[in-house]
Amino acid sequence: MAVATRLPFIPPEATSQIIGGDEDLIDLSQEDVVSDNDDRGNASDVESEDGVKRWTVNPEPKPKKISAKKLADTAAFNSWIEEHQETLARDQRKAAIEAARVAGVDVLPAIGFDSERIITSPREYQVELFERAKQQNTIAVLDTGSGKTLIAAMLLRWVITGELEDREKGLPRRIAFFLVDKVALVFQQHSFLTKNLDFPMEKLCGEMVEGVESKAFWKEALEQNEVVVCTAEILSTALHHSWIRMDQINLLIFDEAHHTKKDHPYARIIKNFYIDEQLERRPRILGLTASPVDAKVDPRRAAAELEALLHSQIATAADPAALQHTICKPKTELVVEYVRGRPDSETVLNKQLRKLVGGQELFKKPLNFTTSAASKLGTWCADRYWQLFFKQEDIVKLESRTERDLMKVAALDEITEKHVKQVREAHELVNAHTFSPAALDPTMLSSKVIMLVRILRDQFERGVGAQRCIIFVRQRNTAMLLADLLQQPEIKSHIPSIAAEVLVGGGTTGSSYVNAKINFQQQNRIIRKFKLGEINCLFATSVAEEGLDIPDCNIVIRFDLYDTLIQCIQSRGRARRPDSRYIQMIEKGNYEHHSRILRAKGAEDVLRKFCEALPEDRKLTGNHMNLDYLLRKEKGKRQYTVPDTGAKLSYMQSLVCLANFTATLPHPPETSLSPEYYITTVPGGFQCEVVMPDASPIKSAVGKVHLSKGVAKCAAAFELCLALLKAGHLDNHLQSVFTKQLPEMRNARLAVSSKKKTEYAMRLKPELWSVRGVVTQLFATAFVLENPDTLGRSSRPLLLLSRSALPEVASFPLFFGTKRFSKVRCVPIPGSVQADDTLVEQLTRFTLKAFMDVFSKEYEATAVNLPYFLSPMDGGHGFDFRLAKSPAHLIDRKALAYVSENEKVPYTFLEPDDFFQDKFVVDPYDGARKFFTHHRRHDMKPTDPVPDGIVAPNHRAWRGLGTTHDILNYSNSLWSKSRGFMIFQADQPVVEAALISTRRDFLDDTLRDEDVEPQQCFLILEPMRISPIPADVVAMLLCFPSIIHRVESNLVALDACKLLGLDLRPDLALEAFTKDSDNSDEHDAEKENFQTGMGDNYERLEFLGDSFLKMATTIAIYTLIPDKGEFEYHVERMLLICNKNLFNNALEIGLEEYIRSMSFNRRQWYPEGLILKKGKSKDARQRHVLADKSIADVCEALIGAAYLTGQEKGSFDMAIKAVTAMVKDKKHRMISYGDYYAVYQKPTWQTESANSAQRDMAKKFSERMGYKFKHPRLLRAAFQHPTYPSLYERLPSYQRLEFLGDALFDMVAVDYLFRKFPAADPQWLTEHKMAMVSNQFLCCLSFHLGFNKCIATMSPSILKDIAEYVTEIEEALETAKQEAINAGKTADEYSRDYWVHITHASRLPKCLSDVVEAYIGAIFVDSEYDYSVVQNFFNMHVLPFFEDMHLYDTFANKHPVTFVANMMAHKFRCNEWRSFAKELDTDVTEGRGGRGGNGAVAGEISEINPPKVVSALLVHGKTVVHAVAASGRYAKSAMAKKAIKLLEGMSVEEFRERLGCNCKGVPMEVDGGVPEADVDGEVHGTAV
């Protein structure tokens, strides 16, 4: 057995393990039982000098017996891994990069990293641009997808913050305008901003707002909003009418600013209104564009004119290549030529229609288009257009449109009728036309279209992984026809994997056969389908070139060539994936096409040179500049010399040193991490904050103020290097020792096994019985039945008298048959009895007589030997014990005296009939035969045969040959030899009696009537002994073994509580120590070796205690360790709450002895220490076998019991005391709840004066959430993402508050479920808690509370993910409300589980759930650790979603692993399948070289870098699907999702044929979980 020793910690070798919880790892070692003579070992609370406990791991188990089938599957799995190493390495890289992206980490592709090259993060450009925009009007020229909108959002937040400060000073109100060029962009930008900024905001475009042209409207807009997103035309009109003035605007943001030219509304706003305003009253300007050029003009001239017109300066990247770390240019650019189509390709159908309806206005544009399309697209496309045109709208609508067109010109009725008739004839003509199926035939399709199909076929066939393609066309009809063409069977057969859709603008054209407008919601729905892969090919018009947020693609095709440089740049910018291709289609021999490409390339070169020629102060350097020059003045000033080695750290060298250190941090393959530098302007110059990646032990540092940005950057790096050196993360040679200096025990195997078992001593009797000796006074406890009638005969309470008063013991049920039970109340009687010799002697005789007559145990003992005494009570079960003044008045002294004076009741054969009623009769020769008499039978004599149906006695003589089966022989149980010496009176009375059941265990709730029903019989009393103990007392004495067993179990549990200093409620104390099966901890498994009649086991209390333990230790760590990061917090908490710690501490205390693991034993309930003269001896075994994990679980159950005990008084103190006793660590020495806040020291950042924006945020939250913050800065910190520089508001990120809030929310959810569902088992509670605390729900809750608008982040990917998620959940909510209305309910009665079905769940923006938990942590801290505010939050905002918990009954079962298990077991009925998970070797995931891209040895960083685990589904020895992830849990989940996708649509027959399944169809039992033997193969991982 593992014990604590003072050994250095040695990381364990990789062994088979499975994840067993948030903090623990469960060892799948062999289930073996080891006898340990030293039950506690040397498990002392050993701490090293640094306060970290040192434990050895469990000893290596004996080899586990594995079936031949599993060995074969394991060998097949390992062989498959060896054969597919390259595939697995590629999958792992993809998984790592995707995981980083989902987490909001801007992962940089790895490049050659050396000490001379300092990587500049793309965020630095954004920060620098933001800082510049704060100082002056700026035009941001950055590539498509580089986060320009993020900069706009940051600037809006900064401007509004300043605006709030100005209003407090009494200045007039002003608002910001975000101007766009297209209506669709109004909706998109407003949607993005409202989802990421918590300010009132309006969207305006001419077609959606009535009354926009009025002074009243604009007055209201000005008063109620901080931002207006609108088309430029609307603002221009409002300014023209003076409904709003330029001095009422504080910020103008021009999206796609290159449109500012000539008479464009952008230009009119500047020329007509901005210029006329006084300089100091003008708003700030921010222009956003990918290129300042939008026409066929000299780029230098166009850029200069744009700067002049917008009164701004262009700012662009000095090193555009740096931005390509995140903005990937196409890997390949191709130009593909096609042959010009014949100009005279007009089709016969087109000519017929032109002749018939060519004169009508309705058909002019369609005819022009089809004439052109016949040449450019092919004859099939031209004719297909008419088929769609007349199919799309019925004849009645076409006739109506014709009539409307003629009404405009006041045509005569005859003309109108003629035109309508022509339309009808055209419709008939098209319907009668024979349309040929599409084919790749030059007579049907143009060379251009055939070339497009070939390109698509080539790209989709050769591509690996998901393909995303955008094809740019000039006209919407072209887009629609091409998309339709790809759905034709012949064409689809060439590209079966393609799923095409059209993305066009919101306008309409007369030539379009689709006349309905496409709104922003429809566009967004198409884009989301494109992102999810439901669509993988978009035919798009110019709407997709700029503005719309379209996911990255790997194939971009210009079917119709661009006209301007900006179109070229923007369409090419859509190809941002690393493997992307940009393909331009040009006509062979077309000089104009060739020259257009050359002009675009030339203009791009000129533009680049123009940007390069900009003054240095106009370039975004990312804080990377000529540091040699800047640092000459610093020489000899700030540097640090390591005393031991003489190594010197200077300002310049600190950048290199920090970069090299960062390179050693764990990171996804093929990527590099880099420090993030954030420079802000402060009084006296510039100050920089450096923020390290999450894996760094020190997260950030702030440098001193300097006059230049470059030196400020060095200063920050210098400070962080000093901090790393001080903490020991840099060695004396300034080299990283990071892998050796991570938090100790981070990878320790801190779980204990549920299979590894050991034998321990077991306490059978409580400490109370150890007090023996002379009796001076006695305390009484009455055992009373609440429903005595269920016993089946008359009874009365029994008194137990002891030398010390029994503590209050919980009531419990006794079972007397089917549906017959009664609770036993253990009533302590006030006062005591002064014990005189006579009373003591009578009690002793009665007690020993009861043991002898009722239980056939004759003891040699005196009063000094007995731990307790029994006495009948003078009174019934209904006695009001409040009237009892002293135990002496309740003792039936008369009965005691009679029993004491009479060994048996005298019998003369002459007694009257009433003598034979209700006597307790004992067979002195057979201890199993005891009877209750009913009455005398005058109609029977001893020699009469025993009537039929009477149960035969068990003695040998009755079964012998020649024995007469009469009443006399039935009554005589002597052996054959002795029977001859006995002569019985032949005419003595026969008595009808009942043979009493030998059952002693009435705690078993499975008892049936036949198990305990007395058996009718007929006796003579001469061979018997009539006991002096009254029958009603005997009836209660028969229950006494069960009663005393439960009472002693309770007293033993209370002894353990006393040992810990805990005053627990007795029933909860017993429940916490009750283990009724070998696998009590496996809630969803069938119980092994189940012990009946033990009452409630510890499972529910453990579930509750686990959460409280997590909460209590979390609060302690948050309070006591304010200067560490979230990672260190998790490690610290893990060391406190891990099962290994609880197990070791329990052994040290000796709790294993007190655990109740055995049910009632009829041999062990008797008092100890008595000499047995007659009767079967007691079972001497006093040891039990316990799993290590069971002992740890009891510790958590004790905490749960303490929590419930304390809650009766509304106090946490008892539970806090229990936590302290269980964890035994200096980081948790609190003994009352008040101790937490008593040692909490408010950090300076919390108590500093809040600015106006922070106060405004607190005010809004007070109105919205119902809690008013005393410290608004605490609220703001709860929404500050780690990517947001702390320098901006001098606040930390939300990570520490999230760590705290997570535990608080978990506790309040568990507490609610525990109380709401008192009969629910832990498995049910756990599954439903999963729904309540899942990220999936918390993201939904965050949306409902509007938290998504408040997150401050510098990551464009996070903002994008938030916007996409909010769009999706808004649609899901709207759908749920509509479903409620359709069902006859109100919209507010929608089903609250709508969030479960959101498809975005696989890529949830985790920051949304994080800020919910951080907010909970913030209100808890702000309220001075008032837990009620957390409960109020839960009741107000969470409970409405869970009023009907049955909505979430299947939430846990929807886990993909469980789903696959059920599918294999029940649908396919396959028994030969197995799910494996195995950690991959480093050389598999990192490449055979064994080193990462930055030179760090992979093995060195593997100590903290999450292991690379492959999970695979094997069916009949064949690998069907696989997935790679950072842990076994995630790998299994990913693998299961792939398996579901593969198997869901597969029939049983197809499954058996494809996978070679020949199982006989016996379904496996899978119920809400996964069979361990079949799913948990080899899993390797770490404890963290």
UniProtKB/Swiss-Prot annotation:
GO cellular component, one term: nucleus
Cofactor: Mg(2+); Mn(2+)
Residue span(s) of domain RNase III: 1052-1207, 1258-1424
Binding site for ATP: 142-149
Start and end residues of each PAZ domain: 894-1028
Chain positions recorded as Mg(2+) binding sites: 1298, 1410, 1413
Annotated organism of origin: Neurospora crassa (strain ATCC 24698 / 74-OR23-1A / CBS 708.71 / DSM 1257 / FGSC 987)
Function: Dicer-like endonuclease involved in cleaving double-stranded RNA in the RNA interference (RNAi) pathway. Produces 21 to 25 bp dsRNAs (siRNAs) which target the selective destruction of homologous RNAs leading to sequence-specific suppression of gene expression, called post-transcriptional gene silencing (PTGS). Part of a broad host defense response against viral infection and transposons. Controls the expression of the non-LTR retrotransposon Tad in the African strain, Adiomopoume.
A Pfam family this chain is assigned to: Ribonuclease_3
Protein's UniProt name: Dicer-like protein 1
Highest taxon listed in the record's lineage: Eukaryota
Induction statement: By double-stranded RNA (dsRNA).
Helicase C-terminal domain ranges (all copies): 448-621
Keyword set includes DNA repair: no
BP terms from Gene Ontology: defense response to virus; regulation of defense response to virus; siRNA processing
